[in-house]
Amino acid sequence: MSKSDIIEMQGTVLEALPNAMFEVELESGHKILAHISGKLRMNFIRILPGDKVTVELSPYDLTRGRITWRAK
């Protein structure tokens, strides 16, 4: 899967789940499960409920994603 296949969307974190998983509500209204990308994990970026985030989705599974950015 190339970088051009990835779908980027904005959303809001609703809930922090175990194992660094988060429930995120996208701007379209859909709710997905998302995990933190490696760069956010390495730099100890804290993500809390209510944070605005950018999520990458695979076209193969639109119910799971990867959090790549937390808005300031």
UniProtKB/Swiss-Prot annotation:
Function of the protein: One of the essential components for the initiation of protein synthesis. Stabilizes the binding of IF-2 and IF-3 on the 30S subunit to which N-formylmethionyl-tRNA(fMet) subsequently binds. Helps modulate mRNA selection, yielding the 30S pre-initiation complex (PIC). Upon addition of the 50S ribosomal subunit IF-1, IF-2 and IF-3 are released leaving the mature 70S translation initiation complex.
UniProt keyword Iron present: no
Major place of residence: cytoplasm
Ranges where the S1-like domain occurs: 1-72
Cross-referenced CDD domains: S1_IF1
One GO cellular component, as annotated: cytosol
Molecular functions (GO terms): ribosome binding; rRNA binding; translation initiation factor activity
Disulfide bonds: none
Organism field: Clostridium perfringens (strain 13 / Type A)
Keyword terms, alphabetized: Cytoplasm, Initiation factor, Protein biosynthesis, RNA-binding, rRNA-binding
Record localization: Cytoplasm
Keyword field contains Protein biosynthesis: yes
Family statement: Belongs to the IF-1 family.
Pfam family, one: eIF-1a
UniProt subunit comment: Component of the 30S ribosomal translation pre-initiation complex which assembles on the 30S ribosome in the order IF-2 and IF-3, IF-1 and N-formylmethionyl-tRNA(fMet); mRNA recruitment can occur at any time during PIC assembly.
Superkingdom classification of source: Bacteria
Protein name as annotated: Translation initiation factor IF-1
